[in-house]
Structures are given as C-alpha cells and as structure tokens.
A protein has these predicted regions:
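N-terminal helical cap/lid subdomain that shapes the substrate entry/recognition surface
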Residues: 2-99, 106-107, 118
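Structured, non-catalytic alpha/beta "coupling" segments that mediate domain-domain communication
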Residues: 110-112
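Asp-based, Mg2+/Mn2+-dependent phosphohydrolase catalytic module
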Residues: 1-5, 9, 102, 114, ...
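Structured helix-beta-strand junction loops
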Residues: 107-108, 132
Length: 209
C-alpha cells in the first residue's frame, strides 16, 4: 500500500452540503425537470457564464445576466439571483468531515482544500473554512477550475507532495478522473460516512469514532 502524505478535499458536496442538492431543490420548486440546469451549464462549456464565474472572470453580480442567457439558449428560464440564494443557503459544513480533517492534521499529514468557487460582493463562500486547512486552492483566485489538470498540479506543489502520495475526495466523477490520471488516490463522496471509512482504510487510522 502506498504511503499517503496529504489529503485534498473538495468543499461543496464533501466538506459542506452539496450545491447540486440546492440546484435540485430550485428545479423542484420551479417546476423544472431534474438536471435541467446542470445540462445547460455543461452545454455552455468553458466559455459559459458558470465556467467564467468559477475561474474568477465574473463576480456573482456580473454573472447573473449571462448565466440566464446561457440557460435560455437551452430552453430553460432561470432566475439567477434566486438560484444563487438557494446555493448560499445550502452551504452548511459537515461536522464529521471537519473532525476528520482535524484528526488527519493531528497525525502529521498535510490537508488541502481544492474548490471550484466564486466571489460575491468581495466575499467567498469558503471564507469561514480556511483555518481548517494547510493549503486552500480556489478556482476563482487561481483562474483555473477542476477538472483542468493544472489545478491539481498546483495544489500538489503548494502541499510539497507528489500526486502519487495524495488522496483526493470529490463528489463529481469527472473531477476525480482528472486526479486519478495524475496518480492521485481518489474517493467519490456520495455518502460522507462511507467516504470517511474508505479514507480511514487508505490512511491506516480511524476517522469516525
């Protein structure tokens, strides 16, 4: 078994509740078929408003109109401000994940956050979490977003650890695929407790009491 020297956590959907759940609630509340918004975001691609928001090229305020236009092109009417309010309301931290992060650091391993995020009125939705991590890499700050391989290389450089010695937790398959291709061990977070059990097995010590 390889020796893991650092663990990298996604934020939304891993350390915090998933923004995808908030988007699904918005769709239910507004009579949209499931996954409609995500399909529009994916179809808009790297030139779309969502990708530009996560690279820090737009703030939330300047993102709303082009995002609504992207959705409209794909036949979806979305109130961008209301959707972002749903996402903001869902940004609650998962206490078990924070406790696991503390335990990992107490064992002498380095811990990083690697998040696709954005800036809203000068604030970032992750501002309250930074003290829990040795390294905090944000897409809106570095101008790269997952699954661009360069952002994984960046977090490994910041940690001072080779990718082959890093474990990465994320809730989105394409983000994990890019990390695996660089040699990282990956864990998909669908059930947080199960993910922590898998990470415990990888590290060789318990993260859940």
């Amino acid at each position: 078994m390889r020796a893991i020297e650092a663990v990298v956590f996604d934020i939304g959907g891993v350390v915090q509740e998933s923004p995808l759940d908030a988007i699904a609630r918005y769709e239910r509340d507004h009579g949209l078929p499931p996954n409609t918004i995500n399909r529009a975001v994916v179809a808009a691609g790297e030139a779309g408003a969502w990708a530009r928001l996560e690279r820090g090229e737009l703030t939330v305020e300047s993102f709303l109109a082009p995002f609504e236009a992207d959705c409209r092109v794909h036949g979806v009417e979305v109130n961008g401000a209301r959707l972002m309010a749903y996402i903001a309301d869902a940004g609650r931290s998962r206490p078990r994940m924070l406790a696991a992060i503390q335990r990992i650091r107490e064992r002498g391993l380095r811990v990083a956050a690697l998040t696709n995020n954005w800036v809203a009125e000068g604030r970032r939705p992750t501002d309250g979490l930074r003290a829990h991590f040795d390294v905090f890499v944000e897409s809106a700050v570095v101008g790269l977003r997952k699954p661009d391989p360069r952002i994984y290389e960046l977090v490994c450089r910041e940690l001072g650890v080779a990718p082959s010695r890093v474990a990465f937790l994320d809730d989105i398959g394409r983000n994990l695929k890019a990390a695996r291709e660089l040699g990282m061990a990956t864990i998909k977070v669908e059930d947080p407790d199960q993910a922590l059990r898998e990470l415990s097995a990888l590290l060789g010590f318990d993260l859940i009491d």
